[in-house]
Amino acid sequence: MTIPVESTPWSVHDLGAFSAMLVLAAADKGLGAINAYALVMYPDEVREAMGIGADEIVAIGIALGYPTDSALAAFAPDRVDVNEILTIKD
């Protein structure tokens, strides 16, 4: 996903919100999706491969695909319990 170079800083927030909704919409259609920095860490190569001009900032990459039952895709790393990193105050 890109935004024009002259965009205001708030445009990045809007793009992030849009990308989150796109990921949710993909899930609703049965697609797996994830925002991935690895897809945009080389913006010059992304521009060349995708035909994106220098007037756009390469900001967000989203990987899309259909879920699989392969053992590699089933890998799930150990995670910290959410209560150790999140506090919700009423």
Residue ranges: model-predicted function:
Residues 2-7, 86-90:
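Helix-biased detector of long, well-ordered alpha-helical tracts
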Residues 4-49:
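Small-aliphatic-rich amphipathic alpha-helix that forms the alpha element of a beta-alpha
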Residues 51-54:
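Short, hinge-like loop/turn segments at secondary-structure boundaries
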Residues 58-90:
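C-terminal helix-cap and adjacent tail motif
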